[in-house]
Amino acid sequence: MSFPLANANWHGGRGGHVGFSPVLPPRGDLALDQFKRTFALYRQYGMDYHASFAMGERHLTNVNQILYDKDDTDMTGRVDAMFRALVADSRARGYGEYRTHIEYMDLVAGTYDFNDHALRRLNQKVKAALDPNGVVAPGKSGIWPKGRPA
């Protein structure tokens, strides 16, 4: 028997978690390098490493579950800073984030910046055509209604 996300209470208190899952090429040397850099950031921010790798035919996803106590303000601050450092590290290597917490959707969407954010501009045009009043999930995945700055 398992209890989904029961490990979120790892630190005690009201447990929380934030996922971080960059996608990289399926190469062992890159996976080892990713592990070393990510593990070092966990250590730097005083967090317990809780991650794995999921392999596909043409990709490798480094699935991280950042566990914390929601009532510990010091810990929540470290988690935020660590998450931002993880995103910056992955961006610097050209790795995109698989999915992200709603709090970080704008941050992650900003990393997809090829051709002056061509993907964001396309998504915004599609959103404007399908949802001109911006009522369906405004801001989801960093896609905001027309007239609202990204």
Regions found by a protein language model. Give the residues of each.
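Conserved glycine-rich FAD pyrophosphate-binding loop
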Residues: 1-150
